[in-house]
């Protein structure tokens, strides 16, 4: 805080100085009392000041111009920035009274000095120079002080803009923010060199939170300035989140069931929509690893949908949907449960069309990555070690698996909506490619929930729903449940039993001759590799290498799947037979399947009791078989 002391005026006016103030002026006791009557009345808003011409004319160019005619005794300053409070301080300064310049009044005094033309042209050490000195020494070097003064400038438009005070404060905030970022980076570098894992924490009075007091226009200008100065995207994201939470406090609704209970008036919706659209424009650059949290993007999208009444927010909505789609693998179920706009004619609880676009964006991005990887391989040497991006443990495949699990959970959630049409559900269920799901249990659960909630759908729709499920990817528990599920069509139950029988047969065949089975069962899937020089001439080395990689991936997956299936079979093939027999003893289909299971069981027992070449017991033979298969994978 600064204290400005004004020296005595000219000796000719060092005698008694009289004031007669209107009753509307507070703190009248602070003014010196004089027997000299006032010769000027200044009207500022609803307040009147009975003053003397000479002190004001000696320091204010505007008052001097207004009093060019000596007969004038009344002046109206209706547009004075800061109102009567700022003018009172300026008048006291003209009379030589000590006034305190601080964070709360510096903006008013600076604008008042500009409006009253209290510059050095009329008096030395005038109010304009005093306030400028305070700004340079106390305000501009501090981010927090600059933000506070900038906030006070909001009520001083257009004078604060005319004297360039707003722009200078914004530049000061941007420059100091980047300096602080550089200092923080050097501090982290010192920590890393010293081997200390402790990093400086964000202070509780972090300047980014203070920006929430600014109006939308000033806030937007500050963010644009710090972006141009190179402030990192993580900090910008935190600032945007803090400002949004403060500006829209109580308006963000995450639970779609509560959305219908909240009604905003048209003015509130308009204000909310304007804030959200501005925040979306200020978001950092789009990317698959964006610094903007998924939960924040989802909240913005929900608010855009809730407040939009037409296609006016189309670009904003598309931008948010693309951002969410780019990092969909980071989303949770709550992020994609987007409520429908209540103004529409759709009675469903969730916005299915928006989710279809979001998942499509992610899948298209996945295809673009594959093309980029294929293009990248053209310039790589065949013998060079490269990462297998399509393997189950790769980051790319891991993202696809996360998205597929998210889709299954989403389908299970929206399946409970009684107004959801079958076509919408099927469109979502068929959206993901086949390789996105290693196991189809989640999709089966969602379909079963939908059939339970919608028991009156047509048989054709029921059949189309079940066609989205890959029966070969169902687990043993899911197969057992599906075989007894009366909500499924007969074709689905038969298909499940058929593939279960095939898996049993393949597993037992592999126990007899694993190597022969592998190559016989997959010969139709893998292209024939040529070992001669003539054959290799027809295929380029790049295509041949890609084919070998694909064959190895599929072979490893098949061997791993069969190993797991065989282990489960040895433990559970007896219980499967008992469960199928108990489920419906009167059904010929299950009886016949039980008989086949018995035959397969006897065959499996016979094959396991066959003497091995080494003469060991059946348990040792199985152990030897497992060891051989493990070596074959490596």
UniProtKB/Swiss-Prot annotation:
Pathway note: Protein modification; protein ubiquitination
One GO term of the biological process aspect: protein ubiquitination
Stretches assigned to the NPH3 domain: 205-503
Keywords: Coiled coil, Phosphoprotein, Ubl conjugation pathway
UniProt keyword Coiled coil present: yes
Pfam families, sorted: NPH3
Annotated coiled-coil segments of the chain: 542-580
Family: Belongs to the NPH3 family.
Record comment regarding domains: The BTB/POZ domain mediates the interaction with some component of ubiquitin ligase complexes.
Functional summary from the UniProt entry: May act as a substrate-specific adapter of an E3 ubiquitin-protein ligase complex (CUL3-RBX1-BTB) which mediates the ubiquitination and subsequent proteasomal degradation of target proteins.
Protein's UniProt name: BTB/POZ domain-containing protein At1g03010
């Amino acid at each position: 805080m600064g204290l400005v002391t004004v020296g005595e005026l000219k000796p000719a006016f060092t005698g008694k100085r009289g004031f007669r103030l209107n009753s509307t002026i507070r703190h009248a006791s602070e003014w010196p009392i004089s027997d000299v009557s006032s010769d000027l009345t200044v009207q500022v808003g609803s307040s009147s000041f009975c003053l003397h011409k000479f002190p004001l004319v000696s320091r204010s160019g505007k008052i001097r111009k207004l009093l060019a005619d000596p007969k004038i005794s009344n002046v109206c300053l209706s547009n004075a920035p800061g109102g009567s409070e700022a003018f009172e301080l300026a008048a006291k300064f003209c009379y030589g009274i000590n006034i305190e310049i601080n964070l709360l009044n510096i903006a008013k005094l600076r604008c008042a000095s500009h409006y009253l033309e209290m510059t050095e042209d009329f008096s030395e050490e005038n109010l304009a120079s005093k306030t400028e000195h305070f700004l340079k020494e106390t305000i501009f070097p501090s981010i927090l002080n600059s933000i506070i003064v900038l906030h006070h400038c909001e009520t001083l438009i257009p004078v604060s803009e005319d004297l360039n005070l707003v722009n200078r404060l914004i530049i000061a905030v941007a420059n100091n923010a980047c300096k602080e970022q550089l200092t923080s980076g050097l501090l982290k570098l010192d920590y890393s060199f010293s081997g200390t894992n402790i990093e400086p924490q964000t202070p509780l009075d972090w300047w980014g939170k203070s920006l929430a007091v600014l109006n939308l226009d000033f806030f937007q200008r500050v963010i644009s300035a710090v972006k141009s100065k190179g402030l990192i995207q993580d900090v910008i994201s935190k600032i945007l989140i803090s400002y949004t939470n403060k500006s829209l406090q109580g308006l963000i609704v995450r639970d779609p069931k509560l959305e219908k209970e909240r009604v905003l008036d048209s003015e509130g919706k308009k204000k909310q929509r304007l804030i959200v659209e501005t925040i979306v424009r200020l978001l950092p650059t789009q990317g698959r690893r964006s610094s903007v949290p998924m939960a924040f993007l989802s909240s913005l999208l929900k608010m855009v949908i809730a407040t939009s009444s037409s296609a006016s927010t189309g670009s904003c909505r598309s931008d948010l949907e693309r951002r969410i789609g780019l990092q969909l693998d980071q989303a949770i179920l709550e992020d994609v449960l987007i409520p429908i706009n209540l103004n529409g004619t759709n009675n469903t609880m969730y916005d299915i069309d928006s989710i279809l676009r979001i998942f499509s964006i992610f899948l298209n991005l996945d295809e673009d990555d594959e093309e980029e990887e294929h293009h990248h391989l053209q310039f790589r040497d065949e013998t060079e070690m490269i990462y297998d991006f399509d393997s189950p443990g790769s980051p790319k495949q891991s993202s696809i698996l996360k998205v597929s699990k998210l889709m299954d959970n989403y389908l299970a959630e929206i399946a409970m909506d009684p107004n959801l049409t079958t076509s919408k559900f099927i469109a979502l269920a068929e959206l993901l490619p086949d390789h996105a799901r290693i196991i189809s249990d989640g999709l089966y659960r969602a379909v079963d929930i939908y059939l339970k909630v919608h028991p009156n759908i047509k048989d054709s729709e029921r059949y189309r729903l079940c066609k989205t499920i890959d029966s070969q990817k169902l687990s043993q528990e899911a197969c057992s449940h599906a075989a007894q599920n009366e909500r499924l069509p007969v074709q689905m139950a038969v298909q499940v039993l058929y593939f279960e029988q095939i898996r049993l047969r393949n597993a037992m065949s592999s126990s007899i001759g694993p190597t022969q089975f592998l190559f016989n069962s997959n010969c139709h899937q893998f292209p024939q590799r040529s070992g001669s020089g003539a054959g290799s001439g027809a295929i380029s080395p790049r295509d041949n290498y890609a084919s070998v990689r694909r064959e190895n991936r599929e072979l490893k997956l098949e061997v791993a799947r069969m190993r797991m299936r065989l282990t489960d079979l040895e433990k559970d093939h007896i219980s499967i037979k008992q469960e199928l027999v108990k489920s419906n003893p009167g059904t010929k289909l299950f009886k016949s399947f039980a008989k086949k299971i018995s035959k397969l069981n006897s065959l499996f027992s016979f094959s396991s009791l066959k003497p091995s070449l080494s003469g060991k017991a059946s348990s040792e033979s199985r152990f030897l078989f497992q060891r051989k298969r493990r070596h074959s994978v490596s």
